[in-house]
A protein has these predicted regions:
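A short beta-strand-turn-helix
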Residues: 3-22
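Conserved Rossmann-like nucleotide-binding pocket used by diverse enzymes
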Residues: 2, 7, 27, 53-55
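Conserved redox-active cysteine motifs that mediate thiol-disulfide chemistry
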Residues: 26-40
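Structural micro-motif
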Residues: 22, 63, 69-78, 93-96
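Non-catalytic, surface beta->alpha helical segment in thiol-disulfide oxidoreductase systems
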Residues: 78-103
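Conserved helix-turn-beta segment immediately C-terminal to the redox Cys motif
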Residues: 19-21, 38-57
Length: 103
């Protein structure tokens, strides 16, 4: 399953109103570290399909959402459970570190 692409129009429905775990990758096209993390995020999306919804939010396209969650550096990963923030990770992290967010 590919990651869900988030924007101002679908963030509430896809993340805040979602039941279960949702991992949001806050990134930007110009961000080198974001590009380094992207394959790992895609791998997580495939491996945890049906268990964790994985979404990507381009901060340049939805700056207000990023700011409302205190995203000052990217990449930032935020794990939501039933619409509430559970954990936050800033910077490039390993697959194991991402998996540890919900284990």
């Amino acid at each position: 399953m590919a990651e869900v692409i988030l924007n101002n129009d679908n963030f509430k429905a896809e993340v805040l109103d979602a039941k279960g775990l949702v991992l949001v990758d806050f990134w930007a096209t110009w961000c080198g570290p974001c590009k380094m993390l992207a394959p790992t995020v895609s791998e997580i999306a495939d491996e945890y399909e049906g268990k964790v919804k994985v979404c990507k939010l381009d901060v340049d396209q939805a700056m207000d959402i990023a700011m409302s969650y205190g995203v000052a550096s990217i990449p930032t990963l935020i794990l939501f459970k039933d619409g509430e923030i559970v954990k936050k990770s800033i910077g490039v992290v390993s697959k194991a570190e991402i998996e540890a967010m919900w284990s």
